Amino acid sequence: YCPVMGIELYGDVTTYGTNLDENGGEILSTSADDVVWAIEDADLDPNVSAILLEVDSYGGSGVAGDEIATALKVAEKPTVALIRDGAASAAYWAATGADYIIASPISDVGSIGVTGSYLDYTKQNQNDGLTFIELNSGKFKDTGNPDKPLTLEERALWQRDLDIMHQYFVEQVAANRGLEIDKVKELADGSTVMGQMALDNGLIDKLGSRTDAMQYFINQGAIEYEDLCWY
């Protein structure tokens, strides 16, 4: 019997698999595939009464964040997202699917926004005597290739898609947190805020710790005493 099932969302948020750095080393990451499976499994397990998602992540894939948030929203058992050092960008998106969000007064929360920034290597390549040969079947096929300059048309195309993703992110946070869209837009400048400011703006529900998460479940009638298992 496991009254509360704990699930970790640590490091980069990915849709599946692990992330690698430029040297091929593994980066701490958590996949939506693993988290969604764990949430669904805990929700179906008769020995589990509540679900705790412990978050310490500064983001990653927006799709992954949306998938995790959706899994939390459709879970029939009470859910809490507990933010440790931070829940930013896609990780915060994931947390908004929980019934209740708790964070430390000094947790980083939010970073509602989208980025597509990258390094342009064209000048470095020129200095190294390298020439980029452009071969493609459509003028936008290699948009974002760091070895060629970004044209004005390509920049506009990329910005269009970033704006679409940003708007969807804002809408989902507003819906999940019960906030007005205009309120979320004011907060959606890509910055994080500390716990108290997050609480004041409705991004979280309480300042606290794992003990407060357990007390929430007790108050909801889901459990009678603190007992936590981990996937």
Regions found by a protein language model. Give the residues of each.
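Small-residue-centered hinge/linker elements
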Residues: Y1-P78, G86-N176, E226-Y231
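Short N-terminal micro-motifs specific to bacterial/archaeal maturation
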Residues: E26, I112, D189, I204-D205
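A generic structural-conservation signal
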Residues: L52, A81, E134, K183, ...
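Glycine-rich beta-to-alpha transition loops that act as phosphate-gripper elements at the mouths
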Residues: L82-A88, L187-S191
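Short catalytic/ligand-gating loop segments at beta-alpha or beta-beta junctions
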Residues: S137-K139, G178-S191
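Extracytoplasmic/luminal low-complexity segments enriched in Pro/Gly and acidic/polar residues
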Residues: I181-K183, S191-Y231
